[in-house]
């Protein structure tokens, strides 16, 4: 995580195909209309800051298609690894 303006942000690189595929597999975001819509939604909003996403927004607005909260995922941008925040 990184502190930006006093808040913790979770790194997520939407330009990385591995990360985009992971989002697809998770089925994240209400009214999900494909990864391009997701990227537009995030980059056009205040939750997207230097490739970091506010985990409070993740928990509030992002859910699995089955309705379960997605939780906070942590992504290692350098290695391209994705880790479940709860593990």
Positions of the model-derived regions?
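Structural boundary micro-motifs
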Residues: 1-87
């Amino acid at each position: 995580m990184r502190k930006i303006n006093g808040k913790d942000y979770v790194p997520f690189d939407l330009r990385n195909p591995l990360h985009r595929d992971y989002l697809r597999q998770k089925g994240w975001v209400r009214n999900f209309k494909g990864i391009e819509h997701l990227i537009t939604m995030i980059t056009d909003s205040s939750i997207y800051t230097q490739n970091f996403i506010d985990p409070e927004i993740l928990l509030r607005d992002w859910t699995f298609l089955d309705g379960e909260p997605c939780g906070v995922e942590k992504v290692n941008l350098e290695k391209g690894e994705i880790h479940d925040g709860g593990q």
